[in-house]
Amino acid sequence: MNFSPNKNMPAGSGGNGQDRVLHRTSSSAGKNAMKGVFSQPHLSGANSSTHMYIHDSAVRPKLTAKYSYGSTYAVGSQWYDFSSSNRGPSNSYGSSYEDKFIMGNANRRRTGTPYQGNQFHGTHNHAHSHSQYSSSPHISSSRSKSSQKSDAKKSTIKFHHRTNNEISSIDKVNDPSMQGLICAGKTHLGYYKFSTVDNSMTCVHDFITSNNRNTPKGNSWILPNLSKRTKGAKISNIADVKCGFHNYSNVIAICNNSTDISLYDLNRTTPAEDPMIQILSGHTRAINSFDFNMSQTNLIISGGQDGCVKVWDIRSDSMKRQGRSDLNIKTANDSIRDVKWMPSHNFASLPSSADGKSLNISSPGYTFASIHDTGVLLKYDLRQTTQVDKKINAHSGPGLCLNWHPHQDYIATGGRDGKCSLWYVGDRRSTDQSPYSTTFLSSNATTNTSSIGIGYPGNPVASTFIPETTINTGSPITKLKFRPNYDKIALNSLIALSSMGDEAEVNIYSLARKYIPKHLLTTGKPSLGLVWWNSNLIFNVDSAGYINGWDITNEPTVLDELPKNIVRWRDVDGSGLLFLNQDTGSYEVSDQDELIDLHTFQKQSSSTVKGDTATPGIGLMANIKRGLSHNNVSHFPTERPIPKRSAFSNISKVPISSSTQSSVNKSSTSLSTLATQDELLENKFLKSPLVIPFELPEAYQYSRESKIMELNKRSYIPKVSSVRGSNIEVFKFLARELEFSFRQDKNNEDDAELSRQQSVNEENIRSDLMKRFDISENATWANIVKDKSNKTRERANSISIKQSPIVLSDESEIKSPTIQKLESGDNNVKYESNITKEIQQEKTKNFNPEYRINLLLELVESSNHNASVYSIIDDLPNFKIWMLIRDSLLWDIKMYSSFSENETPEELTGGQLEYPLTNTRKQSLVSDLSRLGTSELSSDYAEHPHAYHGKSDYSSDASEGIKSPVSKLGEQLKGEESNKFVLGRRLSSMSPKRSPDIPKLAAALKIHRQRNENNRESEIESSAIEEEEEDEEEDDDKFNDDEDFKGPATTKDNTIHSIPILNKREARTSFIDTFMTNENSPDAFHNVPYLNKNQSPGYGYSSPKNKNGPSHSFANTPSKLAFLKKLSPRTMSSHSVTRAPSSDWHVEHDPTLQVPPPEKKGAPDNLPPWNTTKLLRQIHANALEMGNVILAVNVLILFQDVYNIAPISIVKESVVHFVRLLHQYELFEIAAAILKYCPWDDLLGPEGDQSTVEIFCERCGELITNEQGKDLPHGYWYCQACSRTNTLCVVCNTPLRKLTMAALKCGHEGHFECFTQWFITEGMSECPAGCTAALL
């Protein structure tokens, strides 16, 4: 077989083992098809001459290069696998880089007709087979003259013989003079001889079919296992055949049936002789593998599905054996797939190692290894069978085969994961072991896994169990064999692989170059077994029943057939360029190469940055123990630098600081450990490929870093762009982020409830003791106990009263409903009276101005948060709506702040209570949708009251014992003879007792009227509280200096008119804008990178800022009442200073206290700037018209109890429909929180709190019913159909009766409380059942 390179074909990458190639062969209907696409990495090992020039760029994802043979004529199509298939470490001269270089098209053509049917058979088909089965290259017209010279070697098959039987295993006869092969199948055990002179092959004897056909009727004893009705004997479905060594070279062992090993004599070929010598029986399940000992030739080892290794001595008397083995070893693992003795080849020219010392290998006559279904590789010594010498987790899936290195302590394993891994299983006790006898690894995988690999001086590798190299084939490996040849350097060894599947080929790899096989031997059907006859001749059997043989000295290498012309961009962004030199390298390494690598490695290690240097003399694992991280391990000279992570690491989930994101030559994880371009070019002893970095321009790098830093800041921000693109995502985002409730639990009564419960428990214990010891209630001790318990209960009740959230202003004792119910017993009348009294007290508390202000502050905070959420998705209309609501609430807070703290609700309302009850039911747990904490506005108001009031608001006279009013204006409006006033649309009456400065008020009224006549346009400034208060101070100072002051103007009934204070000065920051300067304001929202305080705990991300929001500069703009006038037109009358904060809180005052309003003087009445109730009702109606469900429901839930927006029936129906809508979008936690914290309990009706959960048996699948009378002994955890319980808790070993359960990664289940106790309280990290894998 030969490949014809095309000028458009990619070149094979240089270096020993640098190219990763995954090849596949398929054939159908007897046709050999071939199409190839080779993919190779862009960088190669040190002893290769291929040069690679890389422009600096980011690391590409790992690729898996594949090529296949699928058609007779080559096609131009190809495909690439970008998944990372090589998870193991690289060998020393394998590719230093995991990345694959995508190659171009390779048009290839094969000639000749593949063998078909019975065209070739017997001993006369070898010549014809040779001419037909071999491929003759056809040179295409596009081939260059230089490429035609590579056709010196043609792929030829030397032996090709059809057996006409189903065969599945092959082995050689270990007698060089016989030149024989043994092939076995279900009904065939044949002895074949071949000749290297004429390439002929002949079946000498069939030990199964021949003896069965020639056996006379009276001589059935020759084959005792054959009955008279049997047409032919069968060996086994899992067939394996082996031949003995030396004096037992004539012994053949096969699996006669699934649990027996049959021994045949090769020399007994006549019908009169029984070829079967002995049957070894002892396994309880099928035998998968067996092997002859090369040193102690009388020993046979076998392993099977029962997980036992048995050693047989064929010298033992079979009559005395009685089905017992001479040695039985229980491996305590799963079934054994393959077992092999350590070989002891007697190489005639076996030299010493490179340093003149003999090789240090284990005792071959006592050592064996086994591979198991779990992927575990075990090494044993017969002299100590109770202890495993080595235990290695070789594969992620089942291990299928293994093979020992011919003369060194290495084992190659193949598994279902498609990997062929090389493991060192010897003991490196000598610190001066030469690296030349084995290898010196210098690949990038060694920095990740095993630079402590083969031949590292003084390296304690016995406990690391890291593969020295890994070959990825992409298909499960069923057979592998080392070439029986001595190689001074272990990486120069060849290994033949046979894969499971449709790959009709045998791949021969050099360990020095693991990505591209050295030879590719194609067959007509998938290969089932292979064997090396010597170091050059290899045989295999395929599923078509053919025996094929090749001489690898006459076979071309795959590397010679690869095209060499390719230029590619380094990555998707196009920041690097790759091309190849035409020198492809070789498959071998030399001693000089290792000397160069060792020298360069030491030089690079000593020149690395301090703290990042790894000590080569003690190995990588020792360096890791000394504290070197994965990123700071010094690289080998030809190794690709570890890729620099992005600004936000997906592994650590911690943003990387900008100091580690500087330019490429400054990063500790980039090219700092590589030599510069001049240094590389000066080192002429280094072989290609050379890594030459080209630094990016500083401007580009700076721009790139800026983007990374910006991305780092926004790493926790949700992807708003994806949210905006879908209406469903917008709905889910708003449902999670918006605040639907501001209420929180009254957690302060938990302590009282806990103390009460403890006291009740103690009382129950004492009562039980009294009954148990028959102590009378009249006894002294009993009376003491009862008296003590009563005192304890009273003390608990008093504590609960003090900590109850329901507190009256007069500090009267009101007990909580729970304690009232306990004390009332069966007296329901008394309990109902207590509840009624509690409701009345709640009403009284609701009319407290301080309580109202705190309530409004919570609503302001929720409104501000909702506005910020809408600004995230650039929803400007809804953002403005919530800003409008917030400003309206702030106006209400301003109105209530003018009330005196010692004014009772009766004084404020005239004895009538119309304020609706806010929430009389007991609160539940804290909501996941809102912060529900203390308002920042409230705390800011308490800490900095001067920000909201003038200096004159605080009275300096503390000796009078009267609390100073919050507002000076309120004090001026109070009369001395009146102790009540009514808050309505007009301030109708003033008490003279409350206002000692009546003359000043009269003068103020006169001055105000004069100012109003001169400049009525200044009335627009009356909305700012600070201006009003400062104007009052100026007026007071002016009035104090006026000696002609005579008192205020009054009407005939001595009623003082309201006085709006106006000023001509320029506008100042209003009261509303003052509130907008806190962190919850839109301006503060735009000035912070993300919302830490406004984010919902259940969402997990902070909301990003909106730079395009409408309120970006709103807080910094002076407040003009004209701006507010656009939102709420109004007029201001000369007799109206204030109003009720809302219509729901509007109180009908006493008619006897009303005073007729003054006559209007031409100016229309100016309405107040805000009317919250009307505003909210209009917003709700508009939301219903526009179909804005979230806004409509949000307004109802937040403000219904305060402002009475809609009838209660409509509110409940709206909430129910919204909850069902949340269920449709699987927002169950949001719906549950809304139902939990809304003020109405009966939203879903009587069945709203009920759920039906059907539990089925996990074994039989039947529905488990809990019938009456069976709930105590059985319950929902016992199945009546199969009479078995469900899964038991792995901790307490009791049935899982609750719905709250947990399952571990290993599959064990248990109660959540049990797992909490096991993992959290006790601090365990493993499964309670004893699983070996760590779970935490």
Swiss-Prot record:
Coiled-coil stretches: none
Cellular component, GO, one term: vacuolar membrane
Feature: compositional bias, Acidic residues: 1024-1044
Region (Disordered): 1-35, 107-159, 942-973, 1009-1054, 1096-1115, 1133-1167
Any GO molecular function: zinc ion binding
GO biological process: positive regulation of macroautophagy; positive regulation of TORC1 signaling
Compositionally biased region (Low complexity): 130-147
First and last residues of every WD repeat: 233-274, 282-322, 331-372, 394-433, 472-519, 522-560, 864-905, 1135-1180, 1227-1266
Pfam families reported in the protein's UniProt record: WD40, zf-RING_16
Chain ranges of zinc fingers (RING-type): 1289-1331
InterPro entries in the record: WD40/YVTN_repeat-like_dom_sf, WD40_repeat_CS, WD40_repeat_dom_sf, WD40_rpt, WDR24, WDR59_RTC1-like_RING_Znf, Znf_RING
Compartment list: Vacuole
Keywords, sorted A to Z: Metal-binding, Repeat, Vacuole, WD repeat, Zinc, Zinc-finger
Start-end of Basic and acidic residues biased regions: 942-954, 1010-1019
Biased composition (Polar residues): 113-122
Job description of the protein: May be involved in a process influencing telomere capping.
Membership in a protein family: Belongs to the WD repeat RTC1 family.
Protein name (database record): Restriction of telomere capping protein 1
